[in-house]
A protein has these predicted regions:
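Positively charged n-region of N-terminal signal peptides that target proteins for export
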Residues: 1-5
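Sec-dependent N-terminal signal peptides
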Residues: 6-15
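Sec/Tat signal peptide C-region and signal peptidase I cleavage site
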Residues: 17-21
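N-terminal low-complexity, Pro/Thr/Ser-rich intrinsically disordered segments
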Residues: 22-34
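Short, aromatic-enriched amphipathic alpha-helices that serve as compact interaction elements
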Residues: 31-47, 59
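Short solvent-exposed beta->alpha transition segments
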Residues: 50-101
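Exposed beta-sheet edge and beta->alpha loop/turn motif
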Residues: 97-151
Length: 151
């Protein structure tokens, strides 16, 4: 299982790091873990064009998009004090907290650019959009909990 996570991490970092990388779209073959990894790697490598935010938006749950509004509002939300920590962060660690057939909750430890640690709960649920039926999407991300300075 750990080897699979390492392989997936290397694979997605390679995809996201490529300046001309095509956006990864929701697909039935992607797991809940794949979705959160795609999003976190994209946010870690966000650029001046906000490619990381755009990638993350693709995996926002369709029901949440109704609440957050269009991409422009989602982008503003990610630049808010609570979520900008995710933009160009130094590293992250993903741990499964709980799961059911249609929902996974992950604990995400993020080390910010300023080397401060934060903790988020990341909810991933099955959903449908016009291009993907029964795919995994992020349905919610908690406010961060400040875990203090890194050693």
């Amino acid at each position: 299982m750990e080897l699979k996570k390492i392989f997936i991490s290397i694979f997605f970092v390679g995809l996201v790091s490529s300046a001309k990388a095509e956006m990864i779209k929701p697909a039935e073959n992607l797991s809940a873990y794949d979705v959160i990894k795609i999003q976190l790697d994209a946010l870690k490598n966000n650029d001046d064009n906000d490619t990381g935010i755009k990638q993350t938006w693709l995996f926002a749950h369709p029901e949440n998009k109704k609440m957050t509004g269009p991409y422009a509002r989602f982008r503003i939300m990610l630049y808010d004090v609570h979520y900008r920590i995710l933009l160009n962060h130094f590293s992250h660690k993903i741990d499964l907290v709980m799961n059911t057939e249609n929902k996974f909750v992950y604990g995400v430890k993020v080390l910010s650019e300023e080397k401060k640690q934060f903790y988020y709960l990341w909810h991933v649920e099955k959903g449908n959009d016009q291009n993907c039926k029964s795919c995994w999407f992020t349905s919610g991300v908690s406010m961060p909990t400040d875990q203090g300075n890194s050693i």
